[in-house]
Amino acid sequence: MTSYAPGMLKGLIDSTPDTAVLINLAEHYAGRQLPATGVDSQVVYDCPRTQVMVRTAVKGTTIGTHFHTVCDEIVVAVGGRGEILVNGQWKPVKAGDVHVCPRGIVHDTRALEEDLQYLSIFTPHLPAGTDINWL
């Protein structure tokens, strides 16, 4: 098997960043200090095309109904339980569930009974100043 060093394959239209990322979610979550309320969020991958955040909605948190005009959001539940507003209806989510929300679609996330751990993947990247339009 051939191995390639970071940055070896150049000449792409957009080749930033020039290194890959591997995240151990168990270690990540174990090392985070959660707020008493709200959402803990850390950007773990950032490029012009995509942004990935590892997040925890703390028990009792409702993010708030909103939509995005520029980017689509993919939410991957990786731990705990919660609910996501999908097409106007609250749906239960647990580890292994994936919610794909195109731009312009109203959605929300809440963690009522326990913390909800999830990934948010935005494509394209969230613009400067954010793309959250609250309702």
Where are the language model's segments positioned?
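Structural motif
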Residues: 81-83, 90, 106, 115
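Short, conserved beta-strand element in jelly-roll/cupin
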Residues: 56-58, 67-84
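Short, charged/polar surface micro-motifs in flexible loops or helix N-caps
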Residues: 48-50, 58-61, 81, 90, ...
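Short acidic-glycine-tyrosine-enriched beta hairpin
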Residues: 88-103
